[in-house]
Amino acid sequence: MLFWKVVTWDTLVFLPLYETSPIWLMSHCKAFFAFEMSSRVSEVSTYFASNEFFVLHEIFSKASYFFLVFELFFSNLMDAFLNNIVVFFEFDEPTLRRYISFMDPTLFSIYHPEAVFIQKSLLTTNHLSYFANFKLNVAVLLDKSNAIEPLNYMLQVSFLLYFIVSFQFFFFLSFLKTTRSTKSMLSTL
């Protein structure tokens, strides 16, 4: 088995190189670099503020804001990476669920705005209280997406039926034109 060395600040981690290594890399890099760097920089900034080094406090507080913005950029970059993996490579359903579950859950409602309406309608139809917490699961939505296949088949069958009917219409129309022309030719003789 191949091993992939990943060096962190504290320890040396060995990771087996197989299909989940990009997921592991995405989750650990995102958690380690952005969040821990911004929290460490903000701790240093509060240390400088408590010791009255206000210039360094301002510099490090602005650096912590930069790392928070960088975290948002990095998470969007990783989500685009996962989207490209899902689009360019064909996966079976459990692997696809695993990749989608590692995406940023706040972006799921942006990609699928109907999920918010489904959630609101379920809350109103079940007469749940104001404090009830109801979240949609991505895996459930993926299972329910199998209902889209008959709609696709129905669309394909309707196009096929349209082409068959149009072909028959134009075929008989051309046949009628040729019989009229032959009748007119026979009448002139």
UniProtKB/Swiss-Prot annotation:
Cellular localisation: Mitochondrion
Entry GO terms, CC: mitochondrion
Keyword line: Mitochondrion
Major subcellular location class: mitochondrion
Mitochondrion recorded as keyword: yes
Protein known as: Uncharacterized mitochondrial protein ORF16
Taxonomic classification: Eukaryota, Sar, Alveolata, Ciliophora, Intramacronucleata
